[in-house]
């Protein structure tokens, strides 16, 4: 049986992550409060951010920026701004 969580991002009960994907306290918070669907949305945004801003994951400043964007997206309901990207109309 799948583990369910109340997803902070999507504001609904949904399947939780299978295991903690991010280290530390933030990783525990993500595991306890973010569903698979929201995590997949973040991974798409993360890839776009890394590519468009040409982030280097070996650079601590770039990792810090990406982590802040992740917190903003998953927990504060903020959209990731990617210059030149227009989301498809719904």
Curated annotation (Swiss-Prot):
Pfam families: Iron_traffic (PF04362). The keyword Iron applies. GO terms for cellular component: cytosol. The keyword Manganese does not apply. GO terms for biological process: cellular response to oxidative stress. Keywords: Iron. PANTHER family: FE(2+)-TRAFFICKING PROTEIN-RELATED. This is Probable Fe(2+)-trafficking protein. It comes from Vibrio cholerae serotype O1 (strain ATCC 39315 / El Tor Inaba N16961).
């Amino acid at each position: 049986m799948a583990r369910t969580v109340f997803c902070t991002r999507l504001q609904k009960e949904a399947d939780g992550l299978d295991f903690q994907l991010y280290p530390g306290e933030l990783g525990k918070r993500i595991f306890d409060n973010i569903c698979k669907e929201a995590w997949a949305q973040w991974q798409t945004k993360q890839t776009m951010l890394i590519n468009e801003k040409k982030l280097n994951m070996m650079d601590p400043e770039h990792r810090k920026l990406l982590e802040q964007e992740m917190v903003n997206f998953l927990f504060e309901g903020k959209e990731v701004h990617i210059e030149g990207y227009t989301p498809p109309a719904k």
